[in-house]
Amino acid sequence: MHFAFPVLIVRYETVKKLVLAAALLLASHTQGWSMDSLSHFTWKNRVLLVFGQTDDAKVKKQITTIRAEEAELADRDMVVLHVTQNNVTPIFGNTGGIDAQALAREAGADGNSFKAVLIGKDGGVKLRSEDVVGSVALFDLIDRMPMRRAGQN
């Protein structure tokens, strides 16, 4: 009887260490999917990043599509940013000083070619597209997100 109790403690301690190690591994892996440059938006806003040169036809179309939906953007707590190689320009919402190069690096974009990236309120990447994202498709995706559904109840 006296030997069983210390063995149980050792097993509990071993399990505790394994759970801690797994939690740390999961946290470090999840962090790789987040956008650190946008951390001040976490839990407050969804962010749509539109990468590409200002004169790119897809960039122009994406921005025009988004600007036509300001009420919908506001309803979904969104911020929209146009990111070129060296600049970040707010399209919708309040923004602070954001490093364009760090943002492009974190999103896997070069800032020259078109890419649309949606970041959820949790800071995770929810969508990457090399094609213009229509407003209906964008809002449908957002409306299916658990945080959005929870906010509507």
Regions found by a protein language model. Give the residues of each.
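Non-catalytic interaction/Regulatory regions outside core domains
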Residues: 2-153
